[in-house]
Swiss-Prot record:
Catalyzes the decarboxylation of four acetate groups of uroporphyrinogen-III to yield coproporphyrinogen-III. One of its GO terms (biological process) is protoporphyrinogen IX biosynthetic process. Its main location: cytoplasm. Pathway: Porphyrin-containing compound metabolism; protoporphyrin-IX biosynthesis; coproporphyrinogen-III from 5-aminolevulinate: step 4/4. GO terms for molecular function: uroporphyrinogen decarboxylase activity. Its EC number is 4.1.1.37. Homodimer. Belongs to the uroporphyrinogen decarboxylase family. Keywords: Cytoplasm, Decarboxylase, Lyase, Porphyrin biosynthesis. The gene is hemE. This is Uroporphyrinogen decarboxylase.
Length: 349
C-alpha cells in the first residue's frame, strides 16, 4: 500500500509530506459538475456506485489519501430530522430542534440500518482502491451537528444554539449526548467497513469561547474520540477558527489535530504538542491566487512544519468550487517535490 498518509498520522518518517484536501472531490472538477447535471447531491451520497465514482475522481491529481464522498448531515434523517439542500441556501432542516420535546423525539440508530448506503460505499471504495490508496471516513462533530439542528440550517452567529446551551444546559447535554452516540457508532461502523482513518469535522466550533467549549462540548467529543482509540485507526480532529481552542481540542483527543490557516502551523504544533501529528493549513482561497503565489505559500507551510515527522499537508477548510484544477495539481506536485529531510527544523521526536 501507498501508506505515506498513514505513516504521517502515526508520526513515522516519510520521504515527502503527504497531502490530501478537504472537499477534494467536488464542484471544482469538471467530471463532478457533469455528474451533478444528472443527480442531486443526496442522490450521489445515497447511491454507493456514484459515491465511489466521485470519491475516486480527484485521485488522478496525486493525493495521498481518498476521502469518502458523503455529507456530515446524512445522520439527521434517520435521527428523525429530515433536511434538504435548497438552491442558494444550503441545508434546510424542516423541523428544527429547539426544546426538550424535540430532543426527546430524536432517535439514536444503528448505522447499518439508518445509513447502510454510506457503509456500502465505504466497502465498495475500499475494494476498488485495492490497497493502493488509504481511505478516510468522516462524520460531523456534535457541536456542528447540533448547530444545524437548532438553527435549522446555516447561521452567522449561532444565536439559537447558544441560547439553548446557556438557558437549558440539561437539554443541551441530552441533545449532544444523542448526537455523540450516533457519531460514535457511525465512525466505528465506517472503520469496520474498511475506513483506514477517520476525521471528525467541527466546522462551526470556532464560534465558542474556550470556557463554553470545555463545559458544553469537550466531554462529548472526548467520549467519541476515546472510544475510537480502541479501533487502532488514526483519528483526525478538525475544526475551523479554533486558534483559541487548540489545547482544549488536544485534550479532547485525536491522533491528528487539524489546524486552519488563521494560526501559523509552527505555533499551533507547539501548542498541541509534538506527541500529536498535525494537518493543515493552507488558506483554501490561495488555490484561487496566481499559481506562483499558491506555490510560495504552500512552501511556507512546509517550512513551518520544519520537516518534523507527523505533518499532513492540507487546507484550512475545503476547496471552493471556483478553484482551478491546475493549481490544485501544481500545489500537490510542489509538496511532493520537496524531500522532508531537506526542510529545516527540529529533529523527529
Amino acid at each position: 500500500m501507498h501508506d505515506r498518509f498513514l505513516r504521517a498520522c502515526r508520526r513515522e518518517p516519510t520521504d515527502v509530506t503527504p497531502v490530501w484536501f478537504m472537499r477534494q472531490a467536488g464542484r471544482y472538477m469538471a467530471e463532478y459538475r457533469e455528474l451533478r447535471k444528472k443527480y442531486t447531491l443526496l442522490e450521489i451520497c445515497k447511491t454507493p456506485e456514484l459515491a465511489l465514482e466521485v470519491t475516486l475522481q480527484p485521485l488522478r491529481l496525486g493525493m495521498d489519501a481518498a476521502i469518502l464522498f458523503a455529507d456530515i448531515l446524512l445522520p439527521l434523517e434517520p435521527m428523525g430530522a429530515p433536511f434538504e439542500f435548497a438552491k442558494g441556501e444550503g441545508p434546510v432542516i424542516h423541523e428544527p430542534v429547539r426544546d426538550r420535546a424535540g430532543i426527546e423525539r430524536l432517535r439514536v440508530f444503528e448505522p447499518e440500518e439508518g445509513l447502510g448506503y454510506v457503509l456500502d460505499a465505504v466497502r465498495l471504495i475500499r475494494k476498488e482502491l485495492d490497497g493502493k490508496t488509504p481511505l478516510i471516513g468522516f462524520a460531523g462533530a456534535p457541536f456542528t451537528m447540533a448547530s444545524y439542528l437548532v438553527e435549522g440550517g446555516k447561521s452567522s452567529d449561532y444565536r439559537l444554539t447558544k441560547q439553548l446551551m446557556w438557558s437549558d444546559p440539561e437539554a443541551w447535554s441530552a441533545l449532544m449526548g444523542k448526537i455523540s452516540e450516533v457519531v460514535r457508532r457511525l465512525l466505528r461502523a465506517q472503520v469496520a467497513a474498511g475506513a483506514q482513518a477517520v476525521q471528525l469535522f467541527d466546522s462551526w466550533v470556532g464560534s465558542l469561547s474556550i470556557d463554553d467549549y470545555r463545559e458544553h462540548v469537550q466531554p462529548h467529543v472526548r467520549y467519541i474520540l476515546r472510544d475510537l482509540e480502541a479501533t487502532g485507526v488514526p483519528v483526525i480532529h478538525f475544526g475551523t477558527n479554533t486558534g483559541a481552542l487548540l489545547e482544549a481540542q488536544r485534550d479532547a483527543g485525536g491522533t491528528v489535530i487539524g489546524v486552519d490557516w488563521r494560526t501559523p502551523l509552527d505555533k499551533a504544533w507547539q501548542r498541541v504538542g509534538y506527541d500529536r501529528a498535525v494537518q493543515g493549513n493552507l488558506d483554501p482561497l490561495l488555490l484561487c491566487a496566481p499559481r506562483a503565489v499558491a506555490e510560495r505559500r504552500a512552501r511556507a507551510v512546509l517550512e513551518e512544519a520544519g520537516g518534523r515527522a507527523g505533518h499532513i499537508f492540507n487546507l484550512g477548510h475545503g476547496i471552493i468550487p471556483e478553484t482551478p484544477v491546475d493549481t490544485v495539481k501544481a500545489v500537490i506536485d510542489l509538496v511532493h517535490s520537496i524531500p522532508r529531510a531537506s526542510l529545516q527544523g527540529e529533529p523527529d521526536r
